[in-house]
A protein has these predicted regions:
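Active-site neighborhoods and metal-handling regions in enzymes and metal-associated proteins
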Residues: 1-391
Length: 391
């Protein structure tokens, strides 16, 4: 279940560093640490020092040292104390101090990139406590280095194009999402609580996903589930019942060893009602029109324009209130973003989530969402679970 070093990825990062004359990049966001080293941090306290030349250095809390040595692509893995008998400060402060020492030791203090504008990040493996930055983090590197620049947008730019290994890992996450949805489709019943459907999906994916095909070490699913009149743009899963003859909508994120899906799938106990048949047909046409525009060289904003124009023509002007296109990879939401006012074109190797939605006043509606790999001649849908869930 160990992936070989992704040399194509490292070459892309180093080409970026060459263009921006960087000695090193410091990564703390768990998704950037994963991207650069293949180590998915357990607590989010760890740091990666990625030099333009030579082996990266990974700094991890002591209990994770052996795990990091096993999974990281780089050989230089060091630990800092998670608990120190003479130092009551939080362990992430020790990580920063150690990183500064490494920069000085390796003579990497001339021009360094740090994550100055990291607005979001993947969760760590324990999920519950997202790590954050603090002023001392920035001050420490600014004091130690002659010059620091913002590496967050530079890494985001590199990450937009997936390597073959990344695509393989995203396929596994999408396969697990389909397995979870098929399990829910076959076992959901009218009257069951939305939360029961959510638990069914999340538990099944975790049970099947850990060890899946001998390739996945950790798999988790995160869902929001709404049924019938409970369907809205974004609200919490509740104890509302699954409604017969109406869709139960599942916003489903699956993470397989740090690579994500962002999907919206549906199921319906029994046959779909007449009004929902009409809505589904409308939304499928809008969805397919948007998918048809996805190919290398197309404007990123086309997805947004086509979806909103189609929803307006269907009689729902101004909908939806949420974005309808974005990148997916080591985060469920990452650049590029498909926005009608934004520049940029689609490129082969991008993976885009496309998600049109129509919502009724007072409750109810429908959303479809899949992840698509952009190719020279079109795109490939990564999840096999059908969008026309009547079949």
């Amino acid at each position: 279940m160990e992936y070989p070093p992704d040399h194509e990825k490292w070459c892309r990062v180093r080409e970026m560093m060459e263009r921006h004359d960087l000695d090193a990049v410091i990564a703390r966001a768990p998704d950037n640490v994963l991207y650069l080293t293949n180590y998915w941090t357990m607590k989010g306290y760890d740091l990666a020092i990625f030099p333009r030349e030579g082996d990266p250095t990974l700094l991890v809390i002591e209990p994770q040292f052996r795990e990091a040595q096993r999974t990281a692509w780089n050989k230089d893995v060091r630990f800092f104390p998670f608990y120190h008998p003479k130092d009551p400060r939080p362990p992430m402060i020790r990580a920063v101090e150690m990183a500064v020492e490494v920069l000085k030791e390796r003579n990497l203090t001339r021009r360094v990139g740090i994550e100055l504008s990291q607005t979001s990040q993947i969760c760590d493996r324990m999920v519950g406590e997202p790590t954050v930055y603090w002023q001392g983090f920035y001050d420490s590197f600014r004091a130690a280095c002659k010059e620091t620049i913002d590496a967050a947008p530079l890494l985001a730019q590199v990450r937009m194009l997936k390597t073959p290994q990344e695509i393989e890992r995203m396929r596994l996450a999408n396969e697990l999402a389909a397995i979870g949805m098929e399990h829910a489709r076959d076992n959901s019943k009218p009257g069951m609580k939305e939360s029961e459907v959510a638990a069914m999906i999340e538990g099944h994916i975790h049970a099947v996903g850990v060890g899946y095909k001998g390739k996945v070490e950790m798999a988790r699913a995160f869902t929001l589930v709404w049924s019938g009149p409970g369907i809205a743009t974004f609200t919490a899963t509740s104890h509302r019942p699954v409604i017969e003859n109406e869709p139960t909508l599942v916003e489903i994120w699956v993470c397989a060893d740090g690579y994500w899906t962002d999907l919206t799938k549906n199921l319906c106990p029994r046959s779909l009602s007449a009004k929902y048949n009409v809505l589904l047909d409308q939304l499928l046409k809008i969805f397919n029109d948007a998918i048809a525009c996805v190919r290398e060289g197309a404007a990123l904003g086309d997805v947004d324009r086509i979806i909103r124009r189609g929803i307006d023509a269907a009689g729902y002007p101004g909908q939806p209130s949420h974005p309808v296109g974005h990148g997916v990879g080591a985060r469920a939401h990452e650049p590029p973003y498909s926005h009608q006012a934004a520049a940029g074109t689609m490129q082969s190797g991008m993976v885009l989530a496309i998600e049109p939605g129509i919502y009724w006043e007072g409750g109810g509606g429908l959303r479809l969402e899949d992840n698509f790999l952009v190719t020279a001649n079109g795109c490939e849908k990564l999840c096999s679970y059908p969008d026309d869930f009547r079949r």
